Amino acid sequence: MNENIVIVDAGRSAIGTFSGSLSSLSATEIGTAVLKGLLARTGLAPEQIDEVILGQVLTAGVGQNPARQTTLKAGLPHSVPAMTINKVCGSGLKAVHLAMQAIACGDADIVIAGGQESMSQSSHVLPRSRDGQRMGDWSMKDTMIVDGLWDAFNNYHMGTTAENIAQKYGFTREQQDAFAAASQQKTEAAQKAGRFQDEIIPIEIPQRKGDPKVFDADEFPRHGTTAESLGKLRPAFSRDGSVTAGNASGINDGAAMVVVMKESKAKELGLKPMARLVAFASAGVDPAIMGTGPIPASTKCLEKAGWTPADLDLIEANEAFAAQAMSVNQDMGWDLSKVNVNGGAIAIGHPIGASGARVLVTLLYEMQKRDAKKGLATLCIGGGQGVALAVERM
């Protein structure tokens, strides 16, 4: 790239709990609110956008190309193309990479990229219903589990991959609960200090009676969480296991997006860049330990950027599970005081198609607050992959 490609604005919805405040809205409706909010904040006209690229994992029965639905619902003209991508938990960050590539290749000037997800509205389906079932029980499948949370190669839940990591690294239940409690406590402190306020775009949720409800604060964090309280929970995936609902991320709803363009375009439009996109990398690992994906992805990304872990001022590494996040921290060897300083997905939540963009949005705003220069966003991916993006404030 001969010219810097930058993010000029970033925003996200507050993250909703499963069947919680956002559950009455589809993924496209949540995404529409965020996209409209970004247009309003930047002052960009809808017709100035060249493309919209959004991650969404749970798309069964939601209609053709959800990103296109979001684009038109947000008031962008028919002439603006849109693409939905599915790289499971890495979808929202890969969308930003695709925006970066499109601009670098001269295929677009301004791209909005990110992700959206309603895990609450994911469908149950009846397999082989076109052929019929002549005898016996006929079971429906939960697409949230099958398409979002189930390892297709080993035929078990993502939680089992976390158990595999805990066994491989020797992480105890107590260590995992302590990690999860710390995440909750950091998020509680951040919420009480208003540290997420700037990044959240409020969403109006229609009510059956009266005025719409304004949803503008993450509702998944459990204030007052301690390692002792987490220690009372039963293992979720194995009778003798150590992974519980308390030391794993949540099932959530939300959306997050960024506005990407060249530095010269930002200057032309009078928009101040939040950061430049420095490098991106994807990597593959054994699906049975999919949570280690950020290790090779982050290593490759840092090599491309010409950085080392010690150069990073701030890191957002998605917490799919405590054991998973601990393995990444251990092998990367980075300064833990710089990682997920306001808590991670164990506390904030993990709307899978949106999380890649969510960690990036959170990273960008916290870098501003701390005057940090170099940052990294990274996530593991079900099926055995990882993604990482390096950014630098200018």
UniProtKB/Swiss-Prot annotation:
Q: What CDD domains does the annotation carry?
A: thiolase
Instruction: Identify the Pfam families for this entry.
Output: Thiolase_C, Thiolase_N
Listed under catalytic activity are: 2 acetyl-CoA = acetoacetyl-CoA + CoA
Q: Which GO terms describe its biological process?
A: poly-hydroxybutyrate biosynthetic process
Ordered alphabetically, the record's keywords are: Acyltransferase, Cytoplasm, PHB biosynthesis, Transferase
A GO molecular function held by the record? acetyl-CoA C-acetyltransferase activity
Q: Which residues form the active site?
A: 89, 350, 380
Mind telling me which SUPFAM superfamilies this protein's record contains? Thiolase-like
As recorded in UniProt, its EC number(s) are 2.3.1.9
Q: Which GO terms describe its cellular component?
A: cytoplasm
Respond yes or no to whether keyword Zinc-finger is given for this record. Answer: no
List the InterPro entries.
Thiolase, Thiolase-like, Thiolase_acyl_enz_int_AS, Thiolase_AS, Thiolase_C, Thiolase_CS, Thiolase_N
Metabolic or biological pathway, per its Swiss-Prot or TrEMBL entry: Biopolymer metabolism; poly-(R)-3-hydroxybutanoate biosynthesis; Metabolic intermediate biosynthesis; (R)-mevalonate biosynthesis; (R)-mevalonate from acetyl-CoA: step 1/3
Top-level taxon in the UniProt lineage: Bacteria
Q: EC class of this enzyme?
A: transferase
Which compartment or compartments is the protein found in? Cytoplasm
Where's it mainly located? Answer: cytoplasm
Tell me how this protein assembles: Homotetramer.
Task: Name the protein family.
Answer: Belongs to the thiolase-like superfamily. Thiolase family.
The cross-references to PANTHER family, in alphabetical order and at most eight, read: ACETYL-COA ACETYLTRANSFERASE, CYTOSOLIC (PTHR18919:SF107), ACETYL-COA C-ACYLTRANSFERASE (PTHR18919)
User: What is the name of this protein?
Assistant: Acetyl-CoA acetyltransferase
Task: Say which species the protein is native to.
Answer: Allochromatium vinosum (strain ATCC 17899 / DSM 180 / NBRC 103801 / NCIMB 10441 / D)
| Gene name for this UniProt entry | phaA
